[in-house]
């Protein structure tokens, strides 16, 4: 006999686009409107707060990603909650960590809402859309060893890929 898990509320992982509210998708905006609580990095919650002021906002500083995810899950146990990130939630966003922690919160239903990435938006803005093969590489060594970042850049360059660089102001970026 299988006993079901009671789903009390929902957690949305929402990519809010490249920073300009006009670039947020209709699906992302609809999900945010359904939520009572919006959790995110302080800079991102401040952007959304201007357009959806009647929500409860919970923010954490940079480098507190795991704490942010756990807070979002805690709120989602009783209220519809969104955890927001810039760009797409699956591209250097929060989706991976939220999924990794899901086993701790079986009674929370999880939905991931994609967003427009900075790479795609930037290409369009520059008049050089990414229409062929390309690579996206972060210069941050917080989660990826410096040597691996260098190897990825070399391999992408050897493959003649357009390379979209994320985190160009990372501490080690000048050395790469």
Q: Model regions: which residues?
A:
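Glycine-rich beta-alpha junction loops
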Residues: 88, 141, 167-170
């Amino acid at each position: 006999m299988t006993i079901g898990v009671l789903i009390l509320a929902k957690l949305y992982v929402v990519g809010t686009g490249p920073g300009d509210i006009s670039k947020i998708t209709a699906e992302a905006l609809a999900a945010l409107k359904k939520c009572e609580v919006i959790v995110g990095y302080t800079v991102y919650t401040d952007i959304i707060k201007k357009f959806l002021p009647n929500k409860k906002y919970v923010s954490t500083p940079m480098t507190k990603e795991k704490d942010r995810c756990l807070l979002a899950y805690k709120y989602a146990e009783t209220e519809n909650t969104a955890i927001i990130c810039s760009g797409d939630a699956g591209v250097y966003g929060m989706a991976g960590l939220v999924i990794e922690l899901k086993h701790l919160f079986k009674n929370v239903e999880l939905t991931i809402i994609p967003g427009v990435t900075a790479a795609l938006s930037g290409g369009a803005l520059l008049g050089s859309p990414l229409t062929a093969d390309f690579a996206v590489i972060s210069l941050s060594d917080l989660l990826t060893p410096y040597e691996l970042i260098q190897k990825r850049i070399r391999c992408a360059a050897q493959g003649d890929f357009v390379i979209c660089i994320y985190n160009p102001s990372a501490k080690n970026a000048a050395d790469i």
